């Protein structure tokens, strides 16, 4: 095993052996497991040490000088994401991972799902947040708040600051994969424009005023009562966002029906999911998904609609 690792460590910079900036470098870890402390082949032959780092993607960098051409990223893009944005170009010492047709990542078909970054055993593909903030010190399992799919993530943190969001391997809804939003676009949680305190205003022309939660809730309740007294109980309704969890959506409809006394409740997810929701409801009695990815492996029959599995 040591001899197998030796050629791999002759490709990236030799500083990889003692280097710990990436924190999860599999190549470095396996070198330690096999007892490899120095390489025999050196850097006299062809290599990629003078390759220019691709920083075109806003979320991660691609440093070809650290690549061992293991093909993991290519397979992740093909087999996990299904985008086929990466390939191995060249032959022999000229072999390298190529986005598109030797293009920068942002000019290729890459959708920034992060599957290649997660699969990379070195620091060739690395999150920019890790480079800027350093290595995470602890983590916590959480759920993505972007939509109702419920993808599970491991929030890796340094103190109280999120360093990166990694798709959780045991996530029932995503199984260690995610889209660009959950994987990289979580900065809204700490964005300077995010409202962190309750605010009220008497009219649209008045400035917002920061108040306590009790004052905000009492003001909202009094205004709802005033509107219903003037325009009737059907004058108020509730619409939930597709970012809401099932529990939050349930509470909104309960508030509208129990407190406001009407059925004026809806969710924006109904518009795009109404056909599938109706079909599932008629067939299974519920409009929500009833299976996990694991259950597909045990299915006797799989019906695929609107796709070309042979492509």
PLM region descriptions:
Residues 1-112, 117-143, 161:
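Fe-S ferredoxin-like electron-transfer domains
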Residues 13, 70, 131-311:
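Catalytic alpha/large subunits of respiratory electron-transfer oxidoreductases
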């Amino acid at each position: 095993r040591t001899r197998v690792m030796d050629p791999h460590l002759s490709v990236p910079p030799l500083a990889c052996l003692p280097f710990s900036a990436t924190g999860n470098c599999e190549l470095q870890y396996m070198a330690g497991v096999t007892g490899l402390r120095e390489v025999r082949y050196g850097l006299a032959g062809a290599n990629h040490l003078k390759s220019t780092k691709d920083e075109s993607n806003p979320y991660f960098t691609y440093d070809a000088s650290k690549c061992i051409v293991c093909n993991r990223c290519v397979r992740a893009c093909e087999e996990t994401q299904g985008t086929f944005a990466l390939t191995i170009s060249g032959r022999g010492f000229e072999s390298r991972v190529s986005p598109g047709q030797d293009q920068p990542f942002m000019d290729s078909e890459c959708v920034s799902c992060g599957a290649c970054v997660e699969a990379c055993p070195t620091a060739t593909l690395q999150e920019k947040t890790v480079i800027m903030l350093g290595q995470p010190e602890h983590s916590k399992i959480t759920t993505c708040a972007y939509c109702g799919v419920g993808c599970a993530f491991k929030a890796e943190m340094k103190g109280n600051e999120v360093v990166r969001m990694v798709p959780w391997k045991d996530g029932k809804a995503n199984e260690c994969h995610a889209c660009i939003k959950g994987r990289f676009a979580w900065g809204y949680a700490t964005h300077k424009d995010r409202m962190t305190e309750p605010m009220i205003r008497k009219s649209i022309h008045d400035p917002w005023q920061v108040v306590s939660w009790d004052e905000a809730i009492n003001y909202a309740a009094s205004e709802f009562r005033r509107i219903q007294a003037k325009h009737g109980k059907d004058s108020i309704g509730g619409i939930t966002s597709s970012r809401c969890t099932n529990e939050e959506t349930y509470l909104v409809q309960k508030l509208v029906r129990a407190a406001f006394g009407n059925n004026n409740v809806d969710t924006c997810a109904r518009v795009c999911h109404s056909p599938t929701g109706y079909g599932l409801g008629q067939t299974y009695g519920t409009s929500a998904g009833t299976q996990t990815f694991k259950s597909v492996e045990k299915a006797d029959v799989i019906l695929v609609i609107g796709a070309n599995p042979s492509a």
